[in-house]
Swiss-Prot record:
Regions annotated as coiled coil: none
Native species: Halomonas elongata (strain ATCC 33173 / DSM 2581 / NBRC 15536 / NCIMB 2198 / 1H9)
GO biological process: ectoine catabolic process
Cofactor(s) demanded: pyridoxal 5'-phosphate
Record's protein name: Diaminobutyrate--2-oxoglutarate transaminase
Gene behind this protein: doeD
Keyword terms, alphabetized: Aminotransferase, Cytoplasm, Pyridoxal phosphate, Transferase
Cellular component, GO annotation: cytosol
Family statement: Belongs to the class-III pyridoxal-phosphate-dependent aminotransferase family.
EC number: 2.6.1.76
């Protein structure tokens, strides 16, 4: 019989893993795990060990694991027609129906959907659209895109440049020249630096910094601004009060397109269909992935607004067929999975559950950790939450990075059979469980997290990193 160790040893020899210390993993000095199944909010490894997946894979398994309806939809579509390209006007029934459903959910002002396979490639498409749009309008110099520090938009050359996290730039010669990064809407630390600044004042400050950057670069060179409604991988940071209204006003003033990256927030995660709806954002372009299929198949998309679509049509009238395409765009199996997934979200009221049970998640996290000696902030929205750890919560001071407090918290949670993610920048533990999560499951997530956090806190106290209470 093939053991778990056998599989991991084989894996070490042949697989290039993302976000992994490649040498340590290949030489057996970093752990591996083979996942064999899942049901609801739990996954199981080859040894039969069961974990609560408090992060829904990577914020993506919105409907939970083991949904036979989606598997059946993929199977039936594979029997009927597994693949044909969608170039030069070719289509398939699932693509048409899924596009109609996405546009219905997105609401007025959105015109068409273009498909890819990942959020990264969707944002590559966004940048090509932005360039093409301005070339058609006779503005070839208007090509710069402003993103935000701590934003996450992918890990390609262009999409990785949009990402505002150091680990995705270092040693890759990123960002590319046309990408800029403005201040993150991260009120928690800014308020500590400038005591007395309200959330509304901080939002105005962020908008002023954006306007300052646009003016410094030259408004005739800045094409677009991209942002997640809620910062995801940058720390699960909901925007401060009034932030998006202030930002949108600046973009309108300088004729800068707004790209809403809904890869994490879309399809119910915030308790609304889209994070844009939750915060009153009016984007020109929207990026989608993850919750679109709940990761039962790879699928991403770009939703193109009316304003942009009119120019794209105009461009092909002048230049001929648009020079962009992916082999797997509009893949029939992915679109079939998307349709089945969105039907489950709608039928079972999972967006409403993300709002209601998500509110309970926020309440329970705050009750458990608001006064904890190493927790500086408890934050979140909908079915997303984060704990930010601090050596001195009153002063909001960071731990020494060498202590690796975030990774230690994540490892301690894993010992409690709970998956919670150590975010890549700062000592932050993130949660984004499936939208199917119940109140009872929230209670279990919080209980396991308490045990993990207390275990690491005790260790830090013994090490002299913090003072005993």
């Amino acid at each position: 019989m093939t053991t778990h160790k056998d599989l991991i040893d084989r894996d070490r020899k042949v697989t290039f893993h993302a976000s992994t210390h490649l040498r340590d993993f290949a030489h057996g000095d970093a752990p591996g795990r083979v996942i064999t199944g899942g049901k609801g909010i739990k996954i199981v490894d080859k040894d039969g060990r069961e974990f609560i997946d408090g992060f829904a894979g990577l914020y993506c398994v919105n409907i939970g694991y083991g949904r036979s309806e989606v598997a059946e939809a993929i199977y039936q579509q594979a029997l009927e027609m597994s693949y044909y390209h969608t170039y030069v006007g070719h289509s398939n029934e699932p693509q048409i129906a899924l596009s109609e459903k996405i546009l219905e959910l997105a609401g007025p002002g959105m015109s068409k959907v273009y498909y890819g396979m990942s959020g990264s490639d969707a944002n590559e498409t966004q940048l090509k659209i932005v360039r093409y749009y301005n070339n058609v309008l006779g503005r070839p110099q208007k090509k710069k895109v402003i993103s935000r520090m701590r934003g996450y938009h992918g890990s390609g050359i262009a999409s990785g440049s949009l990402t505002g996290l150091k680990a995705f730039h270092d040693h890759f010669d990123l960002p590319i020249e046309t990408i800029r990064h403005t201040e993150a809407p991260y009120y928690y630390h800014r308020a500590a630096e400038q005591e007395g600044m309200t959330e509304r004042e901080f939002s105005k400050h962020c908008a002023a910094k954006l306007e300052e950057m646009i003016l410094a670069e030259g408004p005739d060179t800045v094409a677009a601004f991209i942002g997640e409604p809620v910062l995801g991988t940058g720390g699960i940071v909901p925007p401060p009060e009034g932030y998006w209204d202030e930002i949108q006003a600046v973009l309108t003033k300088y004729d800068v397109l707004l790209i809403a990256d809904e890869v994490v927030c879309g399809f119910g995660r915030t308790g609304s269909d889209f994070g844009s709806h939750h915060y009153g954002i009016k984007p020109d372009l929207i990026t989608i992935a993850k919750g679109l299929t709940s990761a039962y198949q790879p699928l991403s998309g770009v939703i193109v607004g009316d304003r942009v679509w009119e120019v794209l049509e105009q461009g092909t009238g002048e230049y001929g067929p648009i020079g962009h395409g992916w082999t797997y765009s509009g893949h029939a199996l992915g679109c079939a999975a998307g349709l089945a997934n969105l039907a489950i979200i709608e039928r079972e009221g999972l967006t409403a559950n993300a709002a209601e049970t998500g509110a309970y998640l926020q309440e329970r996290m705050k009750a458990a950790f608001a006064d904890h000696p190493v927790v500086g902030q408890v934050r979140g929205v909908g079915m997303m939450a984060a704990l930010e750890f601090s050596v001195d919560p009153a002063a909001r001071r960071h731990f020494d990075p060498s202590l690796k407090v975030g990774p230690r918290m994540s490892a301690a949670a894993l010992e409690e059979d709970l998956i919670a993610r150590a975010m890549p920048q700062g000592d932050i533990l993130g949660f984004a469980p499936p939208l199917t999560t119940t109140r009872e499951e929230v209670d279990e997530i919080v209980a396991r997290t308490e045990r993990a956090v207390n275990k690491v806190t005790d260790a830090l106290t013994r090490e002299g990193a913090i003072q005993a209470a």
